[in-house]
Amino acid sequence: DLKTIKALLPYLVAFTVPEDRDSEDFWMSDYDLYQKIVEGSYKDGFALVVEVSNQVLATALVSFRDEILSGNPSSHLEVIVVHPEYHGTGLAQNLLEVCENRAKEGGAHCMTLHAYHKNTRARSFYEKLNYCGEFLRYRKVL
């Protein structure tokens, strides 16, 4: 159900966003991708949902794309979010492992992701799972 997924996505922004940003901007395009997957108009990725007793506990969204430097087949973790009541249960790690395995089965050589620099909790999680930072994006309001 897209409504329950949409209700979970704002938890992606569990950090202070800059004053000139709207927190909804951090997840609304992801919701648009979920809609396209449900409609069947997006074929270059997959979504996974963890649901128990009609309650969505977690979700992940992965797209397939060429790796930015090598051009090799790759995957990109667009979303992984767990309801706060289930933080620390291992659910995110298990869900990410399923995503990685499915991406590998789909031909991806690696998985990339973006993490906001102030989201230290997410960055620590990814680094613990052997993801390494490669790029730092800079932005200036004009």
What are these regions (language model features)?
Residues 79-82, 88-101, 124, 128:
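Conserved acetyl-CoA-binding loop-helix of GNAT-fold acetyltransferases
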Residues 49, 55-64, 76, 81:
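Conserved beta-strand in the GNAT
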Residues 36-49, 76:
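A short helix-loop-beta-strand connector motif used in the catalytic cores of GNAT acetyltransferases and
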Residues 13-36:
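Conserved GNAT-fold acetyl-CoA-binding loop/helix
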Residues 96, 103-114:
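Conserved GNAT acetyl-CoA-binding A-motif
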Residues 93, 109, 117-135, 140:
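Conserved active-site alpha-helix within GNAT-family acetyltransferase domains
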Residues 1-7:
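A short beta-loop-alpha structural element at the N-terminal edge
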Residues 71-84, 136-139:
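Conserved acetyl-CoA binding element of GNAT-fold acetyltransferases
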